[in-house]
Amino acid sequence: APAPEKKSAALEWKPGTKILLIGGGSSHDYQKWFNEYDTKVLVAAGYSVNYTEDAAVAAKELANVDTAVLSANHGSFSSIAFRDSLTKFVDSGKGLVILHPGLWYNWGDWAEYNKTIAGGGSRGHDRFGEFKVNIIKPDHPLLKGVNSSFSITDELYYYQPDPAGTPIEILASATSTQRAGDYPQVFVVKHPKTRIAGLTLGHDGKAHELAQYQQLLLNCVAWTAKK
């Protein structure tokens, strides 16, 4: 007999500012770090948090939340339903944090995502290892409580702004040891209708367990949620 059709169940929300974590895909332990660990950090800060790897659930739930944290790189997220939902979400003024894998050029059939929402993207990164993040604009709310520079063991993404896309404001950068150039690590996508924060860090526990990373994540969520 064929397997029963999977129904996309609605998520249950507790009172408070609602944060939807959207993950799933390849090359990362999404459940351990982007779900369980980041959820623990955000719940401890008083947020109502849910995580999904289901593009259909995410498309439906975006209408119910204050901020989304998008780390997914799975192909299912280029569905028309999710594209439309995310576009409406940002156009309505709701906040968006784009995290590590979400800043890749993941969806070849959805160029508008990188151009308009992410302001650019990455197609490569240094080998996993230690590097230094340097703060450029320490007075910005995204960098509240963050050291002027700190070391992290992570993937240094070669994120590059799209010259034809939504402009970005770089708040922190890192210099690659494996190719020429400085690359944005923390930035704002200057979308005309909402607040979008970009955080290229976060490959695994070496980042997610780091106090500086956790502070950046909390800052990104608070700023995009206008809290």
Whereabouts are the PLM-identified features?
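Extracellular ligand-binding/catalytic regions of CAZymes and related secreted enzymes
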Residues: 4-17, 44, 177-181, 191-227
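Helical hinge/lid and interdomain linker segments adjacent to catalytic or ligand-binding clefts
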Residues: 11, 20-22, 27-105
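Extracellular/periplasmic catalytic domains that process cell-envelope and extracellular macromolecules
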Residues: 12-15, 43, 60-64, 90-92, ...
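Hydrophobic/aromatic beta-strand patches that form the interior of the parallel beta-sheet core
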Residues: 20, 97, 171, 197-199
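His-enriched metal-coordination microenvironments in redox/metal-binding proteins
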Residues: 26-28, 100, 125, 179, ...
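A glycine-rich, often tryptophan-bearing local segment used as a flexible ligand/cofactor-contacting loop or short
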Residues: 76-145
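Oxidoreductase and adenylate-handling cofactor-binding alpha/beta cores
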Residues: 113-119, 150-155, 159-166, 212-227
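Catalytic beta-strand/loop cores that center a nucleophilic Ser/Cys/Thr
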Residues: 124-196
